[in-house]
Amino acid sequence: WTVYHYAKEKGMEICRQKYGKFVCDILDYIVKGGHPNLFLHDNGLLYSNGKERVISWMNAVVDGRPVNPRSGYLVEFNGLWYNGLRFAAALFAEDKEMASKVEQWNAIADKTAESFVHTFLNDYGYLVDYVDGAMSDWSVRPNMLIALSLDYSPLDKRQRKRALEVVTRELLTPKGIRTLSPKSYGYNPTYVGSQTEREYAYHQGPARPWLMGAYADAYLKIFGISGVSFLERMLIGFEDEMSQTCIGSISELFDGTSHSLNHDYWTLAGELYQRWFRN
């Protein structure tokens, strides 16, 4: 993702010269089974075991075990995987010596795209959070936003628009994106209580400002320039926050209904993203 945005800024040729080998090495490492917890299945999707340890940014732990044991095919992992494959193929498209690699990456991406839609897109129009064997987690969570925000998507525009409508309706707040829909089981919008109580609530409803970056990207991909005014109205509310609580910054998370909590590196990353977007 980062290298892709570097390529958008500097151009494909400069990016290929500087980071081309790095991109190729990462994909080869995964395809050849080098990663200890990313397994490429025949359907083109990446499988990860998260039953006993956290493997995603939803990393709350109680008594050494994940509060949210996301395991199997994770929606954001596979959205990023598809994006990476298509980007690498585009990066080396003009390099004849890499023709066989490009063909391999595109062949895997074709499988990934078909399997992604079949695996994650449900009848209600949004993306399930993860799938492990016969078990699908239908909780409405913001991880689908990462997949929706990418330039290379397995979903067509109509599918992305329908999924984004669910995010807007159930997860969007004036202070960020909820980590869980109020309609989903286990929703807890407030991060209060003992350490254990707070860990259980951490990704169960409080809103995260940093996710507004992914939301903005996904929204603009659907609505284009006509969506800018709506996003500006959403983001303008953060200006007052920078003079309260976390002076010069933004709180890490807010109640799902919305009071600010402590500052965090996630939000710093989100702030940088927003500044880039607004420029």
Segments the model singles out, each with a brief description of its role:
Residues 50-73, 191-202, 252-258:
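Acidic/His metal-coordination segments adjacent to aromatic residues that form catalytic metal sites
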